[in-house]
Regions:
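An accessory alpha-helical subdomain
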Residues: 118, 122-124, 130-168, 175-178, ...
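Conserved AdoMet
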Residues: 153, 177-201
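Catalytic cores of RNA-modifying enzymes
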Residues: 1-140, 173, 184, 193, ...
Length: 202
């Protein structure tokens, strides 16, 4: 039906398929050569996190404006030290500048879902907010930092870095962080500084 509806429009291309299997960067380069495309979508809640992760890492959209579950929107825009703040937050804020625009109550849908939704705009950063020696070490540190949320950062880091606990504690303190700090308390700058120190020590 949609194909018939847009048949007369030369500026509309319908691509049918599973978006999670779509090579986004290739499609964007082919369809929007020389342009800075934006993405607007009402995302299925079950693919929100993996789809947005793929989008921001591909870097093929200037901006993403999406309708998603409110709880996920809050995670994207969360600040260090809050319950919503996590590795996904760091990922989204590393690649984009996110802003929660407004909430959408479940009464706007038929049938109404059991959750509230929200619209989030994520503008792709022209430059990374922090500089790191190695992005691989940075993400390794971020993943480890949130691996054991109820434990101290030193304990969590052991899941990703094969260094003695005493050595890890020394590195954490050398970065100006208290030995009892938890991973969710660190912002992007602290994670960048810590990742560089860990990479140098390994």
């Amino acid at each position: 039906m949609l194909a018939e509806t847009i048949a007369g429009y030369g500026n509309f291309t319908l691509i049918e398929g599973d978006v999670m299997k779509l090579p986004l960067a290739e499609v964007a380069a082919e369809q929007f050569q020389g342009l800075e495309p934006v993405l607007c979508a009402n995302l299925p809640y079950n693919i929100t996190t993996p789809f947005l992760t793929e989008c921001v890492r591909a870097g093929c959209f200037r901006q993403l404006t999406v309708l998603i579950q409110k709880e996920v929107a809050q995670r994207i825009c969360a600040r260090p030290g809050t319950g919503e703040y996590g590795a996904f937050t760091v990922l989204m804020q590393y690649y984009t500048e996110p802003e929660l625009l407004f909430e959408v109550p479940n009464t706007c849908f038929m049938p109404p879902p059991k959750v509230t939704s929200a619209v989030v705009r994520c503008v792709t950063r022209r430059e990374r907010p922090v500089r790191v020696v190695s992005e691989e070490s940075f993400w390794r540190t971020v993943r480890a930092g949130f691996a054991l949320r109820r434990k101290t950062l030193v304990n969590s880091l052991q899941t990703g870095w094969q260094l003695p606990k005493e050595r890890l504690a020394g590195i954490v303190e050398s970065c100006g962080l208290p030995p009892t700090v938890r991973g969710e308390a660190l912002g992007l700058e602290e994670y960048a500084r810590l990742a560089d120190a860990l990479a140098a020590a390994e």
